[in-house]
């Protein structure tokens, strides 16, 4: 669909996550965008989450020192999304596919046939912006591991019994998929995909540098020589308020009724403002391809016995010369 839009002459294309299934899908989108001199922006709204943008502001002001390690992921119990009774969107049964409703009609099939990080962009997008991926830095190599798979089968048996047809399905997706990425500038990234087991929602963010770190799971920050107590966490609230991103300060009222806590306003605002101003989008086709391709690459790594594989350079070397553009001010 993205390529179809580009071939139809559309110069600004907004895409849901993700932009392709195979690695070649991603290359085709990149080549098409370059051929038609068009902008492709994957509308990854978590890049605009308020705490995430405050942390980005802190990173850019040097509060954490030189960034060393980052973590993120998609940690969300989706069992009652992958199965339902065909009448309710969430839960009340263990049907999927043609007998399911909403996401259960398609999402569960991925867990049957694929084994990799199936939804990486919520986690990787925000932390990629913290270390200027594709703009002075890039992903160098990737390696993934998948745990055994038990969660979906156990869920089906508990709700539908061991004789239900869904209990006979062999699920391929590991309950926990862990991906490690090395970057050209020396940072390491850890991503986790965790959707088949009981747990509260979390994207598992961690941004750590030579002077301190932030972890969203415990909503805490520690900055050396600035924390209230040595070796003890500060509640992140005061830090996040102090370093609230200028974009949020300016547009918070307009975002009140937008989806996902206001994030949707900001990502759409950025896309539309880029069109109006006839300028490049703050997240472009190279970002979309790099973040989205993690799925295909993680599948490949797992299939090869957890082999470390080279990460493709979708910019064809231009990452060395491109400058950061994401949310540098309060405009968009």
Label each residue range with its predicted role.
Residues 1, 29, 55, 297-298:
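Aromatic/hydrophobic pocket-lining residues that form π-stacking "cages" and hydrophobic walls in ligand
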Residues 128, 198-332:
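C-terminal helical cap and adjacent loop that interface with cofactors, partners, or active-site loops
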Residues 39, 46-170:
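Predominantly a Rossmann-like dinucleotide-binding segment in NAD(P)-dependent oxidoreductases
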Residues 168-181:
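Short N-terminal edge-element motif at the start of the domain
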Residues 1-48, 62:
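Beta-strand-loop-alpha-helix segment that lines the small-molecule cofactor/substrate pocket
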Residues 179-185, 209:
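Active-site beta-strand termini and strand-to-loop segments that position acidic
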Residues 173, 191-202:
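Glycine-rich phosphate/pyrophosphate-binding beta-alpha loops
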């Amino acid at each position: 669909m993205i390529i179809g839009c580009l071939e139809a002459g559309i110069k600004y294309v907004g895409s849901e996550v993700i932009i392709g299934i195979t690695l070649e899908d991603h290359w085709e989108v990149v080549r098409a965008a370059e051929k038609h001199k068009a902008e492709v922006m994957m509308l990854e709204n978590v890049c605009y989450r308020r705490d995430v943008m405050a942390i980005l502001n802190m990173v850019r002001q040097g509060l954490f020192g030189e960034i060393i390690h980052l973590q993120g992921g998609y940690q969300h119990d989706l069992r009652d999304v992958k199965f339902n009774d065909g009448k309710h969107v969430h839960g009340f049964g263990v049907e999927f596919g043609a007998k399911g409703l909403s996401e259960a009609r398609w999402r569960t099939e991925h867990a049957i046939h694929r084994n990799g990080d199936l939804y990486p962009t919520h986690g990787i997008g925000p932390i990629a912006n913290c270390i200027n991926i594709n703009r002075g830095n890039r992903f160098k190599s990737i390696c993934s591991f998948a745990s055994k798979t038990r969660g979906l089968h156990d869920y089906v048996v508990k709700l539908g019994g061991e004789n239900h047809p869904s209990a006979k399905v062999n699920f391929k997706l590991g309950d926990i998929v862990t991906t490690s990425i090395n970057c050209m500038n020396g940072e390491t990234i850890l991503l986790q995909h965790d959707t088949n087991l009981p747990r509260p929602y979390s994207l598992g963010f961690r941004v750590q540098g030579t002077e301190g770190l932030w972890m969203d799971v415990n909503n805490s920050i520690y900055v050396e020589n600035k924390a209230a107590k040595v070796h003890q966490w500060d509640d992140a609230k005061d830090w996040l308020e102090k370093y609230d991103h200028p974009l949020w300060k300016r547009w918070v009222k307009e975002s009140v009724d937008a989806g996902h806590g206001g994030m949707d306003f900001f990502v759409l605002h950025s896309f539309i403002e880029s069109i109006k101003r006839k300028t490049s989008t703050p997240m472009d086709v190279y970002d979309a391809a790099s973040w989205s391709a993690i799925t295909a690459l993680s599948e490949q790594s797992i299939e090869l016995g957890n082999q470390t594989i080279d990460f493709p350079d979708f910019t064809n070397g231009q990452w060395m010369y491109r400058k950061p553009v994401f949310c540098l001010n309060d405009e968009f």
